[in-house]
Each structure stands twice: as structure tokens, then as C-alpha cells.
């Protein structure tokens, strides 16, 4: 599996570091599409390559402005418009990558199922939904939701308990 972070941790545009990626920006789009297609072209014939993966919880970067993890804003979904731009760009990259390499599946890496409704609408050409899941003992409704709402295979790109107390040896 070969992963491109797709702007998750910021990027440099015209020599200026942008810590929070704005996926609707024309220069950002151009850079990310260029890098993703270059990756596909460079590695398409690599023996043992399972799939290409774009991103790493990029949906969380839509509202987390720094290194500190904050609560996900459930009521205030200002990030929804930004999410739509991001997932459209993911799909556009996948289409361009498939034009270069039709032999490998293309996946995105989402933080759990946040914005799954938008993923289903905007990422129709993605082959596999990669997801980082920290729900604890069970994956809950994850399989049912993805099957019903998106209909694509799921790849656990990370999983585990949300928090583990080393003293009590239990989940927090």
C-alpha cells in the first residue's frame, strides 16, 4: 500500500507553508493532483503494490487547526462545505490516477465515518474506504453503515480503543 497524505499535515504553496489545507483553492488542487498522479505514474509497476491510498484522517483536519486534538464539532458543521471540496478533490485525483494505473485499487483514508454521506456523494470512483477507527471493544455499526450508505469495501487503516488507562488496564 502506498499512501500520499494529500495535504493532511499542510503543504507549501508558492514557497509559503500552509498548515491547514484549503481544498477549494486552485493552487492547492493543482499541486495535490500533480503529486497524486506523479505517485501513480512512478509506482504503478511496483511488484507487490496492493493499492494506492490518499490521505490520513483529512476530514479531522477540516476543523482541527493545530496539533492539539479537540472535540469534533457536532452542532457547528462549518466544515461541511470544506469537506465537500476535499472529497470532490479526492475523487478527481482517483479518476486521474486510474487513467494512469487501472491495475490497482484506489482508496482514501477517513477518520472513522465522519462525513460518510458526503463521501458517498462525492467519491463514487474510489474503490475502497480506508478508515481509522478507535471505537473500543466493537466496531459498532461501521460495517452496516458503509454497506448501506456507500457500498464499498472497508479497509482498517488504523484501529484500536479510543483511550486506554495503563493503570487500571481498561478503556477510558
Q: What does each model-found stretch correspond to?
A:
Residues 1-129, 139-140, 147-149:
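Active-site mouth of glycoside hydrolases
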Residues 34-37, 128-172:
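Catalytic-core region of carbohydrate-active enzymes that cleave or remodel glycosidic bonds
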Amino acid at each position: 500500500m502506498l499512501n500520499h497524505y494529500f495535504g493532511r499535515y499542510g503543504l507549501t504553496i508558492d514557497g509559503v507553508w500552509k498548515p491547514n489545507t484549503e481544498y477549494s483553492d486552485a493552487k492547492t488542487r493543482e499541486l495535490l493532483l500533480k503529486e497524486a498522479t506523479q505517485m501513480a505514474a512512478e509506482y504503478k509497476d511496483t511488484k507487490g503494490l496492493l493499492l494506492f491510498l490518499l490521505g490520513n484522517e483529512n476530514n479531522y483536519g477540516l476543523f482541527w487547526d493545530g496539533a492539539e486534538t479537540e472535540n469534533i464539532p457536532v452542532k457547528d458543521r462549518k466544515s461541511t462545505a470544506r469537506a465537500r471540496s476535499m472529497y470532490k478533490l479526492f475523487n478527481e485525483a482517483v479518476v486521474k490516477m486510474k487513467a494512469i494505473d487501472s491495475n490497482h485499487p484506489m482508496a482514501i483514508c477517513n477518520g472513522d465515518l465522519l462525513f460518510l454521506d458526503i463521501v458517498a456523494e462525492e467519491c463514487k470512483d474510489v474503490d475502497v474506504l480506508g478508515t481509522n477507527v478507535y471505537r473500543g471493544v466493537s466496531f459498532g455499526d461501521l460495517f452496516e453503515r458503509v454497506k448501506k450508505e456507500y457500498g464499498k469495501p472497508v479497509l482498517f487503516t488504523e484501529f484500536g480503543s479510543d483511550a486506554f488507562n495503563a493503570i487500571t488496564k481498561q478503556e477510558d
